[in-house]
């Protein structure tokens, strides 16, 4: 999804499909070791379906529809976010490229679990997080915007999807991750990370679904929701 927060750049990509197989190949190609972690579909928010998701869950990606109401809420949230201080251990970046939210969501996920997984030495992900470690969220966004390797890899992942991609996407990815005992919502279109209270690696998935249920309740008539868990391979 491309919005006002991305207006600093005229660059637009095609949106990434919410498809765990596509995302796995994408991440593994960028330097996440295949035996370290993988993306899995979450088929529903009931306890029985959540139990089917491979554990431990390291991060969650959520795709939801952009509406007038959600945009108004985002603007209001930004006013509050700017006044709050979050842990400097949270890896957060802005989104300046249209329709790059899938890639941004994956980078938010990996960037906040680097202590739990191994990245291949010298790979894109290894170099990206080392290069951007001390940057501001906007500097990270610009670094990504100017990197042709990730743009090419994103394009390949888009083509690998099961459905044709349209530039006029009306859905958006966010990431939910646990950092230092807190559940954070990471959305590059917002002013910064949003804390949703206490969490832990053991309860991350259930804690994230509580946040997600509230988001779904605000748009009950839509079916354009999708949830993907990034799980540690054991």
UniProtKB/Swiss-Prot annotation:
Domain UCH catalytic: residue ranges: 12-232
Entries under Pfam families matching the protein: Peptidase_C12 (PF01088)
GO terms (BP aspect): ubiquitin-dependent protein catabolic process
Enzyme nomenclature, EC number: 3.4.19.12
Enzyme class (EC, first level): hydrolase
Reactions listed under catalytic activity: Thiol-dependent hydrolysis of ester, thioester, amide, peptide and isopeptide bonds formed by the C-terminal Gly of ubiquitin (a 76-residue protein attached to proteins as an intracellular targeting signal)
Record carries keyword Lipid metabolism: no
Active-site residues, as the UniProt record annotates them: 101 (nucleophile), 172 (proton donor)
Recorded GO MF terms: cysteine-type deubiquitinase activity
Transmembrane segment boundaries: none
Site features described as Transition state stabilizer, chain residue numbers: 95
Top-level taxon: Eukaryota
Site (Important for enzyme activity): 187
Entry keywords, A to Z: Hydrolase, Protease, Thiol protease, Ubl conjugation pathway
Family: Belongs to the peptidase C12 family.
This protein's name: Ubiquitin carboxyl-terminal hydrolase 3
Native source species: Arabidopsis thaliana
């Amino acid at each position: 999804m491309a919005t006002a927060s991305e207006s600093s750049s005229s660059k637009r990509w095609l949106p990434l499909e919410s498809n765990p197989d596509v995302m796995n190949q994408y991440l593994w190609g960028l330097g996440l070791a295949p035996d370290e972690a993988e993306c899995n579909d979450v088929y529903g928010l009931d306890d029985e379906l959540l139990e089917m998701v491979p554990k431990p869950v390291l991060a969650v990606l959520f795709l939801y529809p952009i509406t007038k109401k959600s945009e108004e809420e985002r603007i209001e949230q930004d006013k509050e976010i700017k006044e709050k201080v979050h842990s400097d251990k949270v890896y957060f970046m802005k989104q300046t490229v249209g329709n790059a939210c899938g890639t941004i969501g994956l980078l938010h996920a990996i960037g906040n679990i680097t202590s739990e997984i191994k990245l291949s030495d010298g790979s894109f992900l290894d170099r990206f997080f080392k290069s951007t470690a001390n940057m501001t969220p906007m500097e990270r966004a610009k670094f990504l915007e100017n990197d042709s390797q990730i743009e090419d890899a994103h394009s390949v992942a888009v083509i690998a999807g099961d459905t044709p991609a349209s530039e006029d996407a009306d859905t958006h990815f966010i990431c939910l991750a646990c950092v230092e005992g807190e559940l954070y919502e990471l959305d590059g279109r917002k002013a910064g990370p949003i804390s949703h209270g206490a969490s832990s690696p053991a309860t991350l998935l259930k804690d994230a679904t509580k946040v997600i249920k509230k988001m779904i309740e605000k748009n009950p008539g839509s079916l354009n929701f999708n949830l993907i868990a990034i799980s540690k391979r054991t």
